[in-house]
């Protein structure tokens, strides 16, 4: 048994915590080299303000605290409060909240990071995609994110394509975690797109108008993406270009409720339509 796994089990026993993979997705990282890579990928400096979601037993948290100006932690499982208070005695720059990150609206940090289950990661991205305070994030998620992103047939994949540049940093074998999960993990980095092309503006509009029917969001997204072109599209022209997309049953749903097949058709249009690719001011 490696030392970090032994330390993990020791702390769990000390604080009388039994990991709960079902309700909280708790699989603790017990591979020390990956903790170092995670902290390094966060690129924190002594001026950095960091938001960490789900600190676990605090191994990554302490690595960040040694480098950053401050670290604010959100932990939904109240069993970890005593552990966090003990870490706070050692690191005065730690702030924590025993609450659900999805109820938080402040993402004005230099780095947002955490090891997250898919059940939290997708809702988190839905919450922060329109929040321009979010600039850079480092996350451990399921390795299936790479396949999902490549297939571009999910809300998560299109959200990432529209608003972020993604880097797949490191595949994490499931044996790196305790208790061992059913699938491998993936360390990723997300950076908000600064230069937005007409092509990506089209996708962004779909989500920024997510409360509208998909066919209306598609039409308005296409019109808005043409603003820097020689000719700004009319509603009639955009409907004609979108063709069957606006006639399919899913087009009457919000983009967040559309089927995988419809989302893939949107991505195919995104790939094939002749956007000018100009960078918007």
Label each PLM-derived region with a short phrase.
Residues 1-205, 256, 262-281:
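Catalytic cores of RNA-modifying enzymes
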Residues 183-271:
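An accessory alpha-helical subdomain
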């Amino acid at each position: 048994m490696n030392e970090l796994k032994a330390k993990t089990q020791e702390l769990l026993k000390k604080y009388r915590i039994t990991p709960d993979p079902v309700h909280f997705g708790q699989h603790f990282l017990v591979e020390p080299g990956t903790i170092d890579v995670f902290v390094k990928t966060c690129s924190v400096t002594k001026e950095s303000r960091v938001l960490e979601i789900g600190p676990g037993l605090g191994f990554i948290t302490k690595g960040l605290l040694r480098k950053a100006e401050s670290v604010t932690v959100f932990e939904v499982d109240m069993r970890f409060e005593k552990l966090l208070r003990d870490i706070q005695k050692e690191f005065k720059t730690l702030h924590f909240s025993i609450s659900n990150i999805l109820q938080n609206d402040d993402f004005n940090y230099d780095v947002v990071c955490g090891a997250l289950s898919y059940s939290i990661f997708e809702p988190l991205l839905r919450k922060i995609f329109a929040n321009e305070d979010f600039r850079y994030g480092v996350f451990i998620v399921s390795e299936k994110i790479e396949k999902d992103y490549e297939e571009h047939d999910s809300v998560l994949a299109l959200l990432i394509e529209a608003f972020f540049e993604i880097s797949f940093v490191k595949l994490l074998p499931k044996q790196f975690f305790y208790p061992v999960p059913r699938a491998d993990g993936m360390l990723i980095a997300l950076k908000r797109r600064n230069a937005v092309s007409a092509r990506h503006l089209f996708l962004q509009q779909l989500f920024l108008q997510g409360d509208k029917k998909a066919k209306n969001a598609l039409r308005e997204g296409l019109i808005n993406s043409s603003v820097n072109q020689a000719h700004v599209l009319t509603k009639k022209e955009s409907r004609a270009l979108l063709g069957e997309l606006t006639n399919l049953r899913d087009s009457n749903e919000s983009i967040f409720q559309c089927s995988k097949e419809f989302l893939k058709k949107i991505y195919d249009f995104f790939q094939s339509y002749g956007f000018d690719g100009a960078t918007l001011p």
